[in-house]
């Protein structure tokens, strides 16, 4: 019987253990997509307690707590920090089988060094006290944790109207050598059917100092803001395509759609598809020109619980997996980008694992131009960010493409404690490849496979995003 969370956690054979300990474990972290608040890095935030760094803003934990019968005031409400932590501690023993159980104890082990103690109501006070004592030390401020975890680069998620002053401050600080770069997230500029679209355009007008009355003016405003992002080192764009649509329209039609929307008239589904497609085509051409990477996160069904949305807002754990078809519209969108000469490096993520093979084969349609792995099938995302989901994604990527060219893991997280997800991913990767060797499905060539693992853990991403590191 294996020991829980030992040094060989998830590594079921000797070859897997060699791959992990000799090639994967010590690789730096290139976290190219996350939701860390850049101001906390700029200010080198000192977190006052475990709740603040660990539970606050974590919708994964809130979903589990609600399922365990925890009242909302102990999740997102007005309860005290210790009360909320105790509610989480009481939930953790019930999460066995959920990745939260693994993540929780990996995060206690690194960076806190808390091992051999499982979080529960019995141990909550001890862990609370030990964790808080460490958080009072400089090594456990925001930057210290990043340095402890051997992070080399993080890409935050930022709106086109953001002034990026925190990124500027970080870049100007010669005492901190981790790259913290903005990522361009222009969803609000193309979601023309969203309730706040008109209000957002006013903010974009102010940020770009351009009056947006026509489609060309919207493009000019976005281009000006991209210049601002580029000046702060941006090399990556990210887009939430909850539903993939495609439509074609000339500029006069796009002007009419925009004018009608600005006057308060909602677009038809066809008009919405035309407008979104036109903006994404324009953006893709700009990304190609600027040598940016574009990411599409596909298939979330958001804000399902309207009562809770009205009560506590979005992004608090009431989203799930959509099952809308995506293949044809995605094919037409990517093909249109390629035809205009503007298909940049692209990473596609799907939330519905049913779509893995769709994405795995779609990226193969647009590879080439001398760039290894130009089109990427992105790592298991959100509800697939767990052992089974990662194995499925990597297995299907290997079967339909080249696993060796995969850019690997990202945290997609709001927490400074989530870097152990890279460790989790690396253990799963090494176990999968070690299993192939064990079954005679891959050669027992430690140099060949070790280099492959090393590349997937760090080097592929470093080369793909072409970001100069310290």
Curated annotation (Swiss-Prot):
Pathway: Carbohydrate metabolism; pentose and glucuronate interconversion
Enzyme nomenclature, EC number: 5.3.1.12
NCBIfam families hit by this protein: PRK02925.1 (NF002794)
Organism whose genome encodes this protein: Serratia proteamaculans (strain 568)
Reaction catalysed by this enzyme: D-glucuronate = D-fructuronate; aldehydo-D-galacturonate = keto-D-tagaturonate
Gene that specifies this protein: uxaC
Protein name: Uronate isomerase
GO terms of biological process kind: D-galacturonate catabolic process; D-glucuronate catabolic process
Record Pfam families: UxaC
Protein family: Belongs to the metallo-dependent hydrolases superfamily. Uronate isomerase family.
